Design a protein with these regions (language model features):
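Formylglycine-dependent sulfatase
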Residues: 1-382, 389-417, 421-427, 435-453
Length: 453
């Protein structure tokens, strides 16, 4: 099915990209031709979920291939270590003979668990950020100037390259992706790109990026940032094609959580998202595309329930090796190819007991078919929403369907019994081993890969 040898894998994980922020998902004001091409040359998933938002827990769950609650991560808990008795996706692929590369944002595990300690053989250093002069700051809008002054004049999205020239950070990442592909075109590789884009604040975005879009108001800045992400997907596709690797490479494109409404992000046709909307569908439903011409169908939509922890099992299926037993994910390939109908999961569950930010991030929920059962705290009554008829979740129908409430609540209770208790973040005294600032790449020392269990 996949030709001679094991395929390459590129996993792109955008920060705060909303379900309604891509043209292939119905967005009308932000052209994303290269990402749209992934969808045209692959499978667009319309019920793809993050079961442990936001950024940090989402990434940890994805890299481990299981519910974060299975290893004691129930909310942000930034700095909580990844379990070391089971392999990460990168460790699994490294054990299969892959060169494993990381570019961009990390935000995973403890301070001593950087990319090189968790299975990546190469990690791109983070370029130094531009330092604005006082004169440059005075030329900026008052709102942007205030944000930058809070960071002592250090830019969020402009960096300085090897030649001392100022670059847009997302462009810099795209060049690193091209470099990685060219360096390893004769090897099996796994590349994980997780840009800082399109995380707030986006008000540094240059006008030429915003001018491509039809977005208005605050959304123009976000739109420009999304346009830059799309440019890098185009660079990647060109690099793969010039190396005759496009049909030998699976590209998985997704987001770590839903849209940031404060930046003008859209979860349409659903409600909710980052900030004030973390109790609704838009916070956890994200765009996800699987693209591999010749191996997956083109221009297909998959409506079944999937989760970000399915990426691990799906990639393992592509490689031809069973996923480790700790994985909660399902190999999606038979569903993406139309060999199996329906959903890979009958149910998906949420239990985000966020110790540090209960007001925004407590979330208890179940998804089943068209239904979403929800409550914020254990003491609250269950609410039930028919997402097909009521995507904005405005009409609680729990009283009309008590049998469904009972069914889903019982399923949730049974799932909770399989979880690991909330773990505390240990105080580490060891030096940080995360991505370092500089140019070029860091390379991992050889280390035994966990066998799982």
């Amino acid at each position: 099915m996949f030709g001679a040898g094991k395929p390459n894998v590129v996993l792109i994980y955008i920060d705060d990209l909303g379900y309604g922020d891509l043209a292939s998902y119905g967005c009308k004001d932000i052209p994303t031709p290269h990402i749209d091409r992934l969808a045209k040359e692959g499978v667009r998933c319309t019920s793809s979920y993050i079961t442990n938002p936001p950024c940090c827990p989402s990434r940890c769950s994805m890299l481990m291939g299981q519910y974060g609650q299975k290893f004691g991560k129930y909310g942000m808990s930034r700095g909580l270590s990844l379990p070391e008795d089971r392999p990460t996706l990168a460790q699994f692929l490294h054990g299969e003979g892959y060169v494993t590369g990381h570019i961009g944002k990390w935000d995973i595990g403890s301070r001593s668990q950087g990319p090189l300690q968790t299975g990546f053989s190469r990690a791109a250093r983070t370029p130094p950020k531009k330092q604005y002069t006082k004169r440059e700051l005075l030329r900026l809008s008052p709102s942007l100037r205030r944000k930058l002054e809070e960071k002592n004049g250090k830019s969020k999205y402009y960096c300085v390259n090897e030649d001392g020239k100022t670059m847009w950070l997302t462009d810099y990442d795209g060049d690193a992706m091209v470099e990685f592909v060219k360096d390893h075109k004769h090897e099996r590789f796994f590349l994980y790109w997780s840009p800082e884009a399109v995380h707030s604040f986006n008000t540094e975005v240059p006008e030429h990026l915003m001018a491509r879009t039809k977005a208005k108001g605050m959304r123009r800045y976000l739109a420009g940032a999304i346009s830059s992400v799309d440019d890098q997907v185009g660079k990647l596709l060109d690099a793969l094609e010039s190396s005759a690797l496009r049909e030998k490479t699976l590209i998985v494109f997704s987001s770590d959580n839903g849209a940031n409404g404060g930046e003008g992000g859209s979860s349409a046709p659903y409600s909710g998202g980052k900030g004030k909307g973390t109790q609704k569908e838009g916070w956890v439903r994200v765009p996800t595309i699987f693209s591999m011409p010749g191996s997956l169908p083109k221009g297909v939509t998959h409506e079944g329930l999937i989760a970000n922890f399915d990426f691990y099992a799906t990639i393992a299926g592509l490689v031809g090796t069973p996923a480790p037993p700790h994985c909660d994910g399902v190999n999606l390939l038979p569903f993406l190819r139309g060999e199996k109908k329906g959903s890979a999961h009958d149910y998906l569950f949420w239990l985000n007991n966020e110790p540090g930010d209960a007001v925004r991030r407590h979330l208890i929920a179940v998804r089943w078919k068209k239904w979403r059962l929800y409550r914020k705290y254990q003491k609250d009554r269950w609410q039930l929403f028919d997402l097909a008829a009521d995507p904005h979740e405005e009409n609680d129908v729990a009283d009309k369907h008590p049998e469904i409430v009972t069914r889903l609540a019982e399923r949730h209770g049974a799932w909770v019994k399989t979880l690991t208790p909330l773990r505390e973040i240990s105080k580490e005294t060891s030096p940080a081993q995360r991505v370092t600032t500089g140019h070029g790449w860091e390379t991992a020392r050889k280390k035994r890969t966990p066998s799982g269990g």
